[in-house]
Amino acid sequence: MIDDKAKEIQAMFQKALGHCELTDNLMGVRYTKLSDNSCFSGLATALGCLVGDILDNRKAMECIAYNGRECATIIKAKGITPVECFGLCPTEDRVCFETKEELDQVIAYWTKVYTPFRAQKASMIQDLEKGRKCEINFINGKFVEEARKLGIETPFNDMIVKCVTEIQNGEYTLEEAWEKNLDRFEIPSL
């Protein structure tokens, strides 16, 4: 519920930052952000690369599209309505596809959303570079956990969790990840 106190706090943030939105759909915001992190932070970490490297590679972008579709399917199955954040809103009409033409449209959507962040290094990569455990189990792993409860298959989220866990466990380095992992993702035929 958005009450007068929340509106008062919003006004302070707007004055200080120039922009602040209120919502009572916290799960929608949470799952939009989780989807965002699952796609580009998860895959970037699994591949040991920057966002721009993904944007420049067709197969990596197909992985993003399939991973995003998994996230949107889970979000819908949970009855959650995503909220647009930073241009991203993981609804079925934006990130789901059945044909190659629709896949191309979804890739164009993700490309538009993420082009401003080409130089971004995922926070999970930064954690691993510092020798810290990353939050893979709370991002992609959260989608995997929810999917199991719902009977939904998540081969792309599963593979991202597997790859990042292997890197985290020292089985190979971030520098080796692109060459080792991109081909492990199986792109279905459309």
Segments the model singles out, each with a brief description of its role:
Residues Q14, E62-L190:
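NAD(P)-dependent Rossmann-like dehydrogenase/reductase catalytic/cofactor-binding core
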